[in-house]
Every structure is written in C-alpha cells, then in structure tokens.
C-alpha cells in the first residue's frame, strides 16, 4: 500500500506525494498545497481592482451596485416641487382639453413627490409616531389617441425624472414565455443611465392595462398567465417592494447578479381604453333606477341610454372594474382614477396648431430647412381635423393624414430652388381625403398663387 501511495502525484504540477507537504485527493484527481497557495494568490489578484480596492462577491455586488449608483441630481424638496396649478399650466401647453384629468393628475403627482420630499428630510423615518404616507398610483381611462401617454410623458418632463413606457400585453406570469414584470423596472433603470437612486424617483406608464383583465368575471380554475397572473405579479411592485432586476433583462436565474430597486417611491400610471366598460356601468345604472322607468331591454333606462360613453364613465365605481376583469387587489393599489374625454373635431383642430410640438409647427420647421415657408389655411386645418375625427383613432390620425398629404410636396420641394412659400388649402385636403392623387402645382401656378 505504501508503494502504491508513493506514486501519487499532483494533477496540476506533477510533483509526487514525497515532494510536497500535503496532497489532497478528489474523485480521480489530486492537488498539492503549493498549487492551492498559487490559486489563492491568483484569486486575490483578481479580486482587487485597478485602484487597489477589494472587489466583492456576487451578493455584495448587488448591494454595492445600488450604493455606487448615487444620483448626480438632487432629490426633490418641498421648495422645488411645482404646485398643482403650476403642473396643470404646464400640461395645458402640451395637451389640449382633458381638464378634469389634468386636475386629478396635478394633485396626485404633487402629493406623490411631496411625500418623497418629506421622506427625504427624514421626518417620516426617525419619528415612530409620525404618520406614514403611502403612495397613490393612477389609472387613466380613455379611448385611443386621447392623450394618456402624452400626459404621463409631459409630467416626467416637468419634474425632470426618468420616464419609461411598458406594454402590459407583452407581460406574462413568471415561468412562462414572455416578459417578467421586473423588465418594466429595467426600462426605467436604462432611462436613468443605470442610476438606481434617480430611477427610484421616476414614473412608469403601463399601457394597455385593460388587456390583462381576466376573461370572465368569475375566477377561472385554469391559469390565465397573461391576464390575472400578470395582475397578481404586479401587486407587490405597485404597492412597493425591493425588486431584483437583472441588468441584462430576460428571465432571472438563481446565480445571476441583480440590481435591487425599491418601487415604493416609483409612481405607476396605468392607462387603457377599456372598451366596453361603459356598458358595464350602464347596466349597473339601469339596475339602480328607481320606479318604473322605460327600459331598452338590456337593463338600461332610457335616461341612462342617452348618456354619452364618456359621461357614463364619470359614474365609474370599483365594482365596475371588477366586473370588467380586474381583480380587487389590483384595483386597490391604483386608488386614483381619471377619465379622459374622446377628442372632437374642434379639439383636434387645436392639437394641430396650439401645442408647443403641434404638427403644423413640426412640418413648418421641416420645410424651413429647405428655405420654404409652409402655411395651412384655417379651412384646411378644419378639414384635416374632421377627417381625423371620422377615422376614430384620436390624435394619432392627424399625423397619418398630414404625412399622406405632404408626401408629394416633401418629395419635390427639396429639388425646387425657386419655391419659397407653399400654402395648403382645403381643396387639396378634400381631394386627398377623397381618394384622389394630389398633384404638386407647377412652378407657374405656385408663383401665381403666391403673388395673389
């Protein structure tokens, strides 16, 4: 046996057992004490960075990542937070109409960031008897193209905080194909240049939130991984928790380094069209009618039937959202709601010309780069707004109409050196929206129009 032991060698350096102090055996391999010392030195060198500071393990990395991403921007204070009236005035410059929704948003956002400033002063943490302030997330209900995303984006611009938009339709419950809910936080972190402290004061807008409603009012015995399952996964994030976010996105795994983000200071604004919600409200209003009122056979009284959809939604209650498919726990974490009105043709006209980034101003700026002055007649603006209203896609239809209308013009004008001014008339809009090809006027015709 001793003879056999004399032939044992280190699998790394090849020294025999007699040449080293200790030889440690493994499953079919051996390593000596000298090789162990060498490996320790190599690891020590790897764990020291270029500045001579020791590096940390993966668990410490998660903590140090949070600590190292200190925000270069100061935290909000009570003196720097804009007042509700100031917030609404800023929204008025960018968003046309929606007065009630602006008022609700202004107060909710002011209270949220006032709460952050109060916690930042330490008043809410040192005094155990002090009242603890909880955040109130916001639910925006309105048809497509009415300004839900623009309102949230404008708020983030005013407050100078990171802003991220997430699509609820791509989210699935953990363990299924699709995006985890933590990927929403990753988008916000990327907008903040991976600055955790700055990201924790940001705003996340979750669009198409109505698409994750469960398919029936009664709880299903089968798994709804993209509906009720997503609502369950979002509960803690909306309420406030420390979430582990993978820096590279995708699914999490146990051995992955994660960045920890506290969501208790992040304002979540959820928006959706909620098509058919007005019918749910009208059915409830019809059932609550007192006396023998004429009915249309669908549980709605004649008086309630004559209400517009937007007017009906002003009578919205939490029970209506439950019947629509949102679970009560989810609704309870979004206590503030605002209903946005559908845009009429008059509002669409204002959107074309009044806001800072109005479409007429955008296209005028584009053509001014080619030394061409672009003008829209008031009748032309009215015709564009009427066509957009007919298409039933809100303000999004305006850009599509103008892009189609200006295609030939923007194709030819850069090559025309003698054209200095162009006026869009109602006749041109009517010809285009009627399906006819809009020819670009000849040089003589343009010159004649300009001189007239």
Curated annotation (Swiss-Prot):
Superkingdom assignment: Bacteria
Tagged with keyword Endoplasmic reticulum: no
Region annotation (Disordered) ranges: 50-79
GO terms classed as biological process: cell division; proteolysis involved in protein catabolic process
Keyword annotations from UniProtKB, A to Z: ATP-binding, Chaperone, Metal-binding, Nucleotide-binding, Zinc
Any one GO MF annotation of this record: unfolded protein binding
Cellular component aspect of the GO annotation: HslUV protease complex
Record-listed Zn(2+) binding positions: 10, 13, 32, 35
Stored InterPro entries: AAA+_ATPase, ATP-dep_Clp_protease_ClpX, ATPase_AAA_core, Clp_ATPase_C, Clp_protease_ATP-bd_su_ClpX, ClpX_bact, P-loop_NTPase, Znf_CppX_C4
Binding site for ATP: 143-150
Domain ClpX-type ZB: 1-51
PANTHER family: ATP-DEPENDENT CLP PROTEASE ATP-BINDING SUBUNIT CLPX-LIKE, MITOCHONDRIAL (PTHR48102:SF7), ATP-DEPENDENT CLP PROTEASE ATP-BINDING SUBUNIT CLPX-LIKE, MITOCHONDRIAL-RELATED (PTHR48102)
Assembly and interaction partners: Component of the ClpX-ClpP complex. Forms a hexameric ring that, in the presence of ATP, binds to fourteen ClpP subunits assembled into a disk-like structure with a central cavity, resembling the structure of eukaryotic proteasomes.
Recorded family membership: Belongs to the ClpX chaperone family.
Function field: ATP-dependent specificity component of the Clp protease. It directs the protease to specific substrates. Can perform chaperone functions in the absence of ClpP.
NCBIfam families linked: clpX, PRK05342.1
Protein name: ATP-dependent Clp protease ATP-binding subunit ClpX
Organism of origin: Prochlorococcus marinus (strain MIT 9303)
Native organism taxonomy: Bacteria, Bacillati, Cyanobacteriota, Cyanophyceae, Synechococcales
């Amino acid at each position: 046996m001793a003879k056999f032991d004399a032939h044992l060698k280190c699998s790394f350096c090849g020294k025999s057992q007699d040449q080293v102090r200790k030889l440690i055996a493994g499953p079919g391999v051996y390593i000596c004490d000298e090789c162990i010392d060498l490996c320790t030195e190599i690891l020590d060198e790897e764990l020291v960075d270029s500045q001579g500071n020791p590096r940390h393990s993966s668990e410490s990395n998660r903590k140090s990542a949070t600590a190292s991403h200190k925000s270069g921007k100061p935290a909000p204070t009570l003196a720097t937070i804009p007042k509700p009236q100031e917030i609404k005035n800023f929204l008025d410059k960018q968003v046309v109409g929606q007065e009630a929704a602006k008022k609700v948003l202004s107060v909710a956002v002011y209270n949220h960031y006032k709460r952050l400033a109060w916690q930042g002063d330490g008043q809410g943490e040192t005094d155990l008897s002090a009242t603890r302030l909880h955040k109130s997330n916001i639910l925006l209900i309105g048809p497509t193209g009415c300004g839900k995303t623009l309102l949230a984006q404008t708020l983030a611009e005013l407050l100078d905080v990171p802003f991220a938009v997430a699509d609820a339709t791509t989210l699935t419950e953990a363990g299924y194909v699709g995006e985890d809910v933590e990927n929403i936080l990753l988008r916000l972190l990327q907008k903040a240049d991976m600055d955790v402290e700055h990201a924790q004061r940001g705003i996340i807008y979750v669009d198409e939130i109505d698409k994750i409603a469960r398919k029936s009012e009664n709880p299903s015995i089968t798994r709804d991984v993209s509906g009720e399952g997503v609502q369950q996964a979002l509960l803690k994030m909306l309420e406030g928790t420390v979430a582990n976010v993978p820096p590279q996105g995708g699914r999490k795994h146990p051995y992955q380094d994660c960045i920890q983000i506290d969501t208790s200071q992040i304002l979540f604004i959820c928006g959706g069209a909620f098509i058919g919600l007005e019918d749910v409200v009208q059915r409830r209003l019809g059932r609550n009618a007192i006396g023998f009122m004429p009915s249309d056979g669908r549980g709605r009284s004649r008086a309630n039937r004559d209400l517009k959809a937007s007017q009906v939604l002003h009578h919205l209650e939490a029970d209506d959202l439950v019947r629509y498919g949102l679970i009560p726990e989810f609704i309870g974490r979004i206590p503030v709601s605002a209903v946005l009105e559908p845009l009429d043709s008059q509002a669409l006209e204002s959107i074309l010309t009044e806001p800072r980034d109005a479409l007429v101003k955008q296209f005028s700026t584009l053509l001014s780069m080619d030394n061409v002055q672009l003008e829209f007649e008031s009748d032309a603006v009215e015709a564009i707004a009427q066509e957009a209203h007919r298409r039933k896609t809100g303000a999004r239809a305006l850009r599509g109409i103008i892009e189609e209308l200006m295609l030939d013009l923007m194709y030819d004008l850069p090559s025309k050196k003698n054209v200095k001014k162009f006026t869009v008339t109602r006749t041109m809009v009517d010809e285009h929206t009627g399906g006819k090809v809009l020819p670009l006027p000849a040089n003589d015709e343009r010159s004649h129009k300009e001189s007239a």
